Curated annotation (Swiss-Prot):
Summary of the function given for this chain in its UniProt record: Could be a nuclease involved in processing of the 5'-end of pre-16S rRNA.
GO CC terms, sorted: cytosol
Gene Ontology terms for molecular function: nuclease activity
Protein name: Putative pre-16S rRNA nuclease
Family: Belongs to the YqgF nuclease family.
Superkingdom of origin organism: Bacteria
Phylogenetic placement of the source organism: Bacteria, Pseudomonadati, Myxococcota, Myxococcia, Myxococcales
A family per Pfam: RuvX
Keyword Hydrolase assigned: yes
């Protein structure tokens, strides 16, 4: 079971996918938006290739937690995507995900041109990782004492 995370923008959709254990998120691609039909087809291809069973879509809330027009558009897209893919689509607070993604890329000394190419998928990765961390059962935390250091 893999989960796909999405950062929905007006021009692009950042896409990330979890590992098979649901522990980590990896940025996969950025979909250039052309039409709803093409967007859904591109996301269906990624979902099929990675055996996605659940989708987490970033919900762009205002800093005070209220919803604006972008949040309403995300809700509508989530409904359409759920019907198109036949999977559950869950909305997840995406506040500051792009800021965190930009900061991470700057700290990694990624060039401006490369940042433009990957910023949306890194933001999707932050959204998905936040969701994965929040939904991880408490007994799956890693404790070094639980493992032998000897081979």
């Amino acid at each position: 079971m893999r989960t796909m995370g999405l950062d929905l923008g007006t021009k692009t959709i950042g896409v990330a996918v979890s590992d098979g254990l649901g522990l980590t998120a990896q940025g996969i691609t950025t979909v250039r938006r052309t039409s709803l039909k093409a967007d859904l087809a591109a996301l269906a291809t990624v979902a099929s290739e990675h055996e996605v069973t659940h989708v987490v879509l970033g919900l762009p809330l205002n800093m005070d937690g209220s919803e604006g027009p972008r949040a309403e558009a995300s809700r509508k897209f989530a409904d359409t995507l759920a019907q198109s893919l036949g999977v559950t689509v869950e909305l997840w607070d995406e506040r500051l995900s792009t800021v965190a993604a930009t900061r991470t890329l700057l700290e990694a000394d990624v060039s401006r041109a490369r940042r433009r190419e990957v910023i949306d998928q890194v933001a999707a990765q932050f959204i998905l990782q936040g969701w994965l961390d929040a939904h991880r059962p408490p007994d799956t935390d890693y404790h070094p004492d639980d493992y032998d250091s000897e081979p």
